[in-house]
Amino acid sequence: MYIDITIDLKHYNGSVFDLRLSDYHPVKKVIDIAWQAQSVSMPPREGHWIRVVNKDKVFSGECKLSDCGITNGDRLEIL
């Protein structure tokens, strides 16, 4: 299923943008897509951790979005 999420890169370049993608992707792939979309020069931190701001939960890069419970409208802060 495709979901619309907001990506927050405040720890890197400060940008916030929306993505529409499959919830079958692992968190690590979502971070790779965000890096390509925003041309971020610094590499992501080890482990590819994210925080789902509106649900106050933290997940590692190995978890699939669907397994993490990430759905439409969630805001992902890349740590």
Curated annotation (Swiss-Prot):
Disruption phenotype: Cells lacking this gene are blocked in YukE secretion. They display an increased bacteriophage SPP1 resistance phenotype. InterPro entries: EsaB, Ubiquitin-like_domsf, YukD-like. Pfam families: YukD. Transmembrane segments: none annotated. Belongs to the EsaB family. Required for YukE secretion. Probable component or regulator of the ESX/ESAT-6-like secretion system (BsEss). This is ESX secretion system protein YukD. It comes from Bacillus subtilis (strain 168).
